[in-house]
């Protein structure tokens, strides 16, 4: 099943997925929204800016500049932009996408202006286009180096989810399917906020007891919000939520965790963002999750605490004291 795939978004994650598709035998073209980045990839046949461990692209992967003019060449479009650029990318696609083409999203987060799920944005703008989400515990560098990785493909259309599953899967990359596109998105987005929380705790040297508590109680918060939005309960103990949460909260390959770590060590937000020197999705997602939780009357103490640190200049030590002295209650 050889296909022609366009990848929009040439960060580490988009590039790693483009490599996976090329290793799988597909013809892949990748585009960066920065012209100079496209020129570098075309000239050097690599993406050393984001994936320096990959010396050269395989023969089936090449950069492309004017993708709109060449849209007819592709069977599927993979969107791997930051969440801030997702809506504009879908709007661009609306102007040129063909009826037989479909979309796969590898973006995690919520719409920055409306706090809507990204699938809702895609369905609103392109109501007749098939849409799937690829998500789960996966660092780009490890996937690019063909280390064993397992993820989830979520779509309302199970047959389309299975198509995407076949598109990507090989001996190094295993895709599972689900129709719970809401739960898969909520887990993948909110875990970025909690990774910041875990990083702050690590930076303040709170220890592994606190780390375990953050992951466990954080999972409970994700589940509460997800169920309110219409997700299935079982999704939250799967790869798209628990798996991704464990990975992102526990390893400094995560930009969100590193950002939190720097904050916990005393840096300001701007200093920490500069030190990470890449998109920190959880910083923006914290605002969306905070507003969604307030809108739906969902109690999320860890998310609210992180929001206060990020947007209200709250002192992390004061926040910890407040969290630990909240009214005692039953775990469930």
From Swiss-Prot:
Residues annotated as catalytic: 191
Pathway: Membrane lipid metabolism; glycerophospholipid metabolism
EC number(s) on file: 1.1.1.94
UniProt keyword list: Cytoplasm, Lipid biosynthesis, Lipid metabolism, NAD, NADP, Nucleotide-binding, Oxidoreductase, Phospholipid biosynthesis, Phospholipid metabolism
Localization: Cytoplasm
Gene Ontology BP annotations: carbohydrate metabolic process; glycerol-3-phosphate biosynthetic process; glycerol-3-phosphate catabolic process; glycerophospholipid biosynthetic process
Family: Belongs to the NAD-dependent glycerol-3-phosphate dehydrogenase family.
Descriptive protein name: Glycerol-3-phosphate dehydrogenase [NAD(P)+]
Species, as recorded: Francisella tularensis subsp. tularensis (strain SCHU S4 / Schu 4)
